[in-house]
Structures are given as structure tokens and as C-alpha cells.
Amino acid sequence: MTLDVGPEDELPDWAAAKEFYQKYDPKDVIGRGVSSVVRRCVHRATGHEFAVKIMEVTAERLSPEQLEEVREATRRETHILRQVAGHPHIITLIDSYESSSFMFLVFDLMRKGELFDYLTEKVALSEKETRSIMRSLLEAVSFLHANNIVHRDLKPENILLDDNMQIRLSDFGFSCHLEPGEKLRELCGTPGYLAPEILKCSMDETHPGYGKEVDLWACGVILFTLLAGSPPFWHRRQILMLRMIMEGQYQFSSPEWDDRSSTVKDLISRLLQVDPEARLTAEQALQHPFFERCEGSQPWNLTPRQRFRVAVWTVLAAGRVALSTHRVRPLTKNALLRDPYALRSVRHLIDNCAFRLYGHWVKKGEQQNRAALFQHRPPGPFPIMGPEEEGDSAAITEDEAVLVLG
């Protein structure tokens, strides 16, 4: 998606970025960061398209301390990206350039944009689609942690989508190496995705610090957000939102959760553990039953004629299934006596009879509410199924109805 160009998006002059211009031709603006702009660019020799992140590091915009901080963070990001190069779900760094005034990072061009924008368009994702995205994300996080790298800024805005809707983790500006047993104390990241230990660490000088577990908390927030269309921790007053995070206060109360499985709710609860020691690791999360469900096989490569035949067979099969479902099957006396409530037609008669006797619906369980299914009483007595014998009544009496209902 092309963005409008403002004064802050002006391209560096040739002298300030000669090495970059010799190899790439910058095009339209496709994204912006706090201190950077992202443009589509074309490799002059091959014509291939990429994305370039351009950061201005001049004294006009930043103090000397800020200049050095930006340069150091970019160098660290470049080093980490080169270390993790080749992973299918991590953005690939193609080139990097540094001049006295600008820094350039050239990446693969992810045409589908951010996961955040995709979620905004869809409102909420299905469990199937969420499963695919979260599996890829956790595989990337597991790879980072295995290489002693913590991301520290996982969120939908930093997850990009390629042409095949596969994700790539990006924006490693807050990432750093973390040796086993080492702890961090720096407050960084996005408020709604911060783990409780990061907040506690910033408030308590005696706090031991935080580790890689903060990435798994963020994964839990992302998982919740994809399914609900809104984050688990939010309040218009940020101080109250941060308190909710530190106490782990969230609920599955919105209507979207009515159709979500208990399995995915369990995974969320295991990721959003306030105690980092009780939180799942990336490897443990990938072993959760939520990811064990069958994703389906790859589609066949069929010719147009074969696809047409499959479509015809599908329509014929659907018609036969519908016919079989609605065909009235013979009802035996033994089946009726064994479990009358298991038969739909008889069940309707029983429920309506109960309403006539008691004046209200008779529930068969605490979770059962059948009132919406039976809104009209029958116009007359219920016929007895099966042949009548001499002396039998042609209608069910009230005493017989009570006996059937037990």
C-alpha cells in the first residue's frame, strides 16, 4: 500500500547515499516508523523489487546521544538479522548501507503488508487461520530463543505477510542477545504487549529482571487478539491497563469467544501466566493440543475437466445426503420404548406435551434451553405411532404423558 509523502519522507541526496543509489532505485513510501521511513525499491541490475528502511541520523533531528543510540541499535539489528538469515518465518536482510547522515536496510518486499492491517480488515480470524499464523510465529520465536536472542517487541504490526499469506517476523530494533541465566532490566516494547515482569522490573530496583519468557507473553496477547479482534488488556487509562497486565486480569467474555474451543483458551491461559516460570516455552507451546489438529492435505493439481467432474460429484453427493437425512425411517416399538427422547420426532411430542401439562418448558439438563425450538403448540392430540390394537385410545392421555416423561 502506497502512503502519502510528507516533508519528512524526502529522499537523501545522491552524495549522502551514493552507494545505495548505485544499486537501488527508491520508489513510493509503503510504511513509516518512529525514526524511519520504508520505501519500495528496485534493484537496478535485476529489476527485482525490495523494501528499504531509511533512517536519518543527523544532528538536526537527534542529539548526539540519540544519534549514537540509533546507530548502535541499527547495527545490533543488522547483526541479529544476519545471524538468523534463512529462517522461513523471519524477514530476510538483503543489504545494508551506512553513511554519515543515513542508514539503509534492504529487505524482502512483503506485498500483503502487516498482520495488523489484515486483522483490522477481517475483524477476527478463525481458529484454523490463527493456528497457522501462531505455529509459524512460535517456530520463529523458538528459533530465536535457541540462538539466545529475545525479540522484545512482538506484535501484529511487526508481523508481515507475503504473497502466499505466510508470515515473516520483522523489526528487530529491540532485539538483543541473552545468554542462559542472564537477565535484562531495560523497559522497552509496546505497552499492551509488555509482560508483567518488565513492568515490575521498571518499578522495583530489587527485581531480578526478565528473560526470554517476555516473548511468550506477547505471543499469548497476539493469539487472544487474533481470535477476539481486540486485545486482552485494555483500558482508556493506561495506568489501569498496566495494572491489569501485572495482575493478569483478562476475560473470555466477548461474543467472539462463544464459538472458540476450550483448547485454544487453555493455550492462551498457559501463555498469559503472570509468573514467567509457569509460562510455556515456545517449544512447549508448539506441542500444545491446539496445534495437533489436522490442517488438511494439500490440494490436488487438477485439470479444468477434472475440477468440473469433482464439482458435479460434489453436487450429486450433497443431494443424496440431504435426501437421506430427510427421509422418514421406520420406527419400531422397541426403539421407542428403549429411549423415546433420542428420537427427534418423539422428542418434539414429549416437549410439547410437557408444556401442555405444566405450562412451562421442562429442562432435561442445566445447560438445556429448548424454548426457542418449539414455539407453536400442536393443534390437537398426538397420534400414537404404530398400529392400534382393539381397546387402545387414539390419543395419549395426560397420565400416559406423565409416564413417558418419567
UniProtKB/Swiss-Prot annotation:
Residues 24-291 form the Protein kinase domain. Residues 346-370 are annotated as: Calmodulin-binding (domain-C). Residues 306-330 are annotated as: Calmodulin-binding (domain-N). Its EC number is 2.7.11.19. It holds the Pfam family Pkinase. One of its GO terms (molecular function) is ATP binding. CDD domains: STKc_PhKG2. It catalyses: 2 ATP + phosphorylase b = 2 ADP + phosphorylase a. The keyword Phosphoprotein applies. Changing S253G: No impact on phosphorylase b kinase activity. Transmembrane segments: none annotated. The active site is at D153 (proton acceptor). It comes from the Eukaryota. Keywords: ATP-binding, Calmodulin-binding, Carbohydrate metabolism, Disease variant, Glycogen metabolism, Glycogen storage disease, Kinase, Nucleotide-binding, Phosphoprotein, Serine/threonine-protein kinase, Transferase. One of its GO terms (biological process) is glycogen catabolic process. GO terms for cellular component: cytoplasm; cytosol; phosphorylase kinase complex. The keyword ATP-binding applies. It is an enzyme of class 2 (transferase). The modification Phosphoserine is found at S345. Changing D215N: In GSD9C; decrease in phosphorylase b kinase activity. ATP binds at I30, G31, R32, G33, V34, S35, S36, V37, V38, K53. It is linked to Glycogen storage disease 9C: A metabolic disorder manifesting in infancy with hepatomegaly, growth retardation, hypotonia, liver dysfunction, and elevated plasma aminotransferases and lipids. These symptoms improve with age in most cases; however, some patients may develop hepatic fibrosis or cirrhosis. Catalytic subunit of the phosphorylase b kinase (PHK), which mediates the neural and hormonal regulation of glycogen breakdown (glycogenolysis) by phosphorylating and thereby activating glycogen phosphorylase. May regulate glycogeneolysis in the testis. In vitro, phosphorylates PYGM. Hexadecamer of 4 heterotetramers, each composed of alpha, beta, gamma, and delta subunits. Alpha (PHKA1 or PHKA2) and beta (PHKB) are regulatory subunits, gamma (PHKG1 or PHKG2) is the catalytic subunit, and delta is calmodulin. This is Phosphorylase b kinase gamma catalytic chain, liver/testis isoform. It comes from Homo sapiens (Human). The gene is PHKG2.
